[in-house]
UniProtKB/Swiss-Prot annotation:
Pathway(s) the chain acts in: Amino-acid biosynthesis; L-arginine biosynthesis; carbamoyl phosphate from bicarbonate: step 1/1
Organism per entry: Halalkalibacterium halodurans (strain ATCC BAA-125 / DSM 18197 / FERM 7344 / JCM 9153 / C-125)
Enzyme Commission (EC) number: 6.3.4.16, 6.3.5.5
Residues holding Mg(2+) 4: 836, 838
Gene Ontology MF annotations: ATP binding; carbamoyl-phosphate synthase (ammonia) activity; carbamoyl-phosphate synthase (glutamine-hydrolyzing) activity; metal ion binding
Identification of the protein by name: Carbamoyl phosphate synthase arginine-specific large chain
Annotated residues for binding of Mg(2+) 1: 284, 298
Binding site for ATP 2: 712, 750, 756, 781-784, 824, 836
Residues that bind Mn(2+) 2: 298, 300
Subunit description: Composed of two chains; the small (or glutamine) chain promotes the hydrolysis of glutamine to ammonia, which is used by the large (or ammonia) chain to synthesize carbamoyl phosphate. Tetramer of heterodimers (alpha,beta)4.
Amino acid sequence: MPKRTDIQSVLVIGSGPIVIGQAAEFDYAGAQACLALREEGIQVILVNNNPATVMTDEACADVVYFEPLTVASVKNIIERERPDGLLATLGGQTGLNLAMKLEEAGILEAYNVELLGTPMESIKKGEDREAFRQLMHELHEPVPESEIVHSVAEAVDFANTVGYPIIVRPAYTLGGAGGGIAESEEALIRIVKGGLELSPIQQCLIEKSIAGFKEIEYEVMRDSNDTCITVCNMENIDPVGVHTGDSIVVAPSQTLTDQEYQMLRSASLKIIRTLGIVGGCNIQFALDPDSKQYYLIEVNPRVSRSSALASKATGYPIARMAAKLSLGYGLHELKNPVTEDTYASFEPSLDYVVVKFPRWPFDKLVHVNRELGTQMKATGEVMAIERNLEAGLQKAVRSLEIKTHGLSLPSLSQWEDSELWVIVKKADDRRFFAILELLRRGVTIEAIHEQTKIDRFFLTSFAKLMTLEKEIAGQSLDDITSDELSTYKKYGFSDEWLASSWGVGLADVRHTRKALGVVPSYKMVDTCAAEFEAKTPYYYSSWTGENDLLLPEKAKERVLIIGSGPIRIGQGIEFDYCSVHGAKSLRARNFEAIIINNNPETVSTDYETADRLYFEPLAVEDVLNVIEVENVDHVIVQLGGQTAIGLTKGLEEAGVSILGTTQDVIDQLEDRERFYEFMRSVEVPHIPGKTAETKEELLKAAQSIGYPILLRPSYVIGGQGMFIASNQEELAAFCEDKNHSVTFPILVDAYYPGVEFEVDVLTDGSDIFIPGMFEHVEKAGVHSGDSMAVTPPPTLEAKWKQQAINYTRQIAKGMAYKGLFNIQFVLYDEELYVIEVNPRASRTVPIFSKATSLPLITYTIDVLFGKTIAELGLSAGYRKESPYYTVKAPVFSYQKLAGLDPLLEAEMKSTGELIAISKDLPSAFRKAFAWGEEQTPALFRKKGSVFCQVDRAYDTEWQPLLRQLKEKGYSVVTEEAMSFSEWLASEDAICLVSVPAPGQKTGKQNREEALKQRVTVVSDLATFEKMIECLEVKDGEPFLLPDVVMN
């Protein structure tokens, strides 16, 4: 069917800020979809309040609204723009749920907006557990014995009939939110109660557990002609019981017989046809490895996390094709852009193995429950491509950046067998490494299979790696042969691991390996197992077979951008935005842009972003291999976050020069003693501090500086390991806490709780350009990534802005650096101090780019290649402030991470961010707080009761807020009047204000309990003050940046 001509404009709903279960994959999908629609001459109107996304660029959409993802907000946009169609299946669960509410409210019908792609009826059949189960019964497709419940009592009755364990799956939630496996009635009551509260339709599916079965996924496409294909099938190494987002996944499936593969493929095609889905769909099965009986677990009637993985694993652009199908095209009419010869109806085939490995946040969030179940906890993931499973696993582990260059976590080697078995049976994020450790100690494959139900095929691969490890340990670099080294490399052992095993330097292994002729070949991802010639410049390394890499004759300078790896707390999608724009700017300036990265969720790993893409670990060995095979002229590290910065030393030692910076400059800013020395040399005040090499020195330093103090490790992201101590007892307790590994040397800073603000700076080595300043709402001591912030600064006096500009200029002139950097200041006691200088693009660069409509990354590329600030047409100094306010607000994933205290501290906890823009500040804050349909605080919806636990140290700030709260009609409850548990059980409970004394964590249990009951928790009075100021502000009109920027 040809493209429809009656659709001229389409509203696309984005997925909003990153939360666990909904990350960068929807930026990739959304950007692809928007570009696909624009290729067809469709006007694209986008609503998405995530500023760090590529899809919110002017190049992706004709009109961009950074507005709340609520029914009221989207209704206003529809009223203003009058789109012909709405595309909601590319915005994750957020987009689907919002589309459903718009339809139920009659808004789509009232404004004659057609839901494109998958019909609403099909969405409901896939998402509504009761409708889905009924349909599967009609199709005779087996589902686990189950019951739909709307109350806890119904759940208990079902469990009493079928027995425990029971799996709970709430309807219309994200990443398994609210779900879990209940081993007892007590656990069932707790999980179902939470699940019903999280489900927008107050519905849960509870089913007899089939934990231990194989979990298999199919990614399927269908067009309106009923043509269907399977794009990719994937197998979870972890059996059913661990959320697929927390499972190690391989593609294609490794343990299915052809009969099993075809059986599940046929079922997938039958299901997508019956549901009537147009576009992409993810279908998950459980397969009994003994009886071959299968059960359908669930269907995602939208582009999903697995879609992004399948797209990168195969090269088949699922989101792009889904967008075209929504306009009426058939699969047979769309060319596959990878081959440019075959059509989209041609099923991909793979001649390699793909391994996806989750990246969890437990290295930062040490007190969180690490146990894995049906509720997702990973913040991101990595993908590795190889010719065998063993090498794929090794590559994936090395891509995680978890301080290991092999297959062991050093801490586990000290554990007793009994301790290892606990995490193997219960499954937490260390399970894979615990299994390997047990295999090292001689535990049999059969014993591990019995306890985990992981297929013996996978365990045999694990055991093979352990056998090779032992063999390598008995070798030496001097005696190694070419064949032996080739074998070790073929199975994925890194140069760094070999160097460590043989007690030699990394450069020694590299030199010997190259002398023996053991070098990687590069293979192409082509969707067709080399059956057709591919045009895509998308490569992975292997140590077997011939080289597919055919480089064009070198007519341009080649520039390598090192990406930022997996999404994690402290290093998110913002850095991918920077990498993507870096590549685009290089190509526009007649350079060949090359990207190396390993995150399957991102736009940077789309094969169309750069001239060539390498899907590799971000380690010195792998980056050097690419530099050598490409004969790279320049390397950029400042766009890839701390990951890329961390590679500078190893690259420099290998003779690679870095654009704009050196390791010496990085050390000058990251090493705190050198940093203080540098600050003194440029005559800029800094926070007083000392470096401690031992615990004794730490206690002495704290005593001499004076409490409160802030512990600050060097070379970390997201404030990892930071801690504020108000006295010696707190500091001693922190040092003794087994959950924290205090690594020395460590910096001891004085803690100044003043007004914090930050600047992003572009420098050509002489002049500076500051696009804006962000003033933080919360005082210094709350990590900048977890602070709300406003630009332009609403309370900062002109003299302090000028002082900051002067200090910035002095720092830029003194540090032999070109490009983007970030400075954080604190104003305390009428004195301005520098907290830190980050020699790279920061997480606020995309926000300033969006809020000012300035191409900051393009400017950065120009500066790196010799242009001055003046030659860019920019006025040196501080850009004129905008006549509107942009509020940046952090977004947390507390519901997914049991045990995480929502207290704002020095260590970052947020997983994403959003922006809200308005001409007046209260309206901007209102949009920031009430940013999503399900996320609007209860405080904004009704006038209930607020429970207050505020330490007396804050009486001066607290009493005026208390009066305002009462004047606005809210009731205030204290512990003297009512117990917390009694208040929480009341229908009026809407908000807990829990602010312990500085440095204290009292009230943690109450904060956690309030979160479980979906009650708003506020732990900082400055945040609460902003909430109160905008409580009675009406929802503002949709705000378009060009309206103001052009005037």
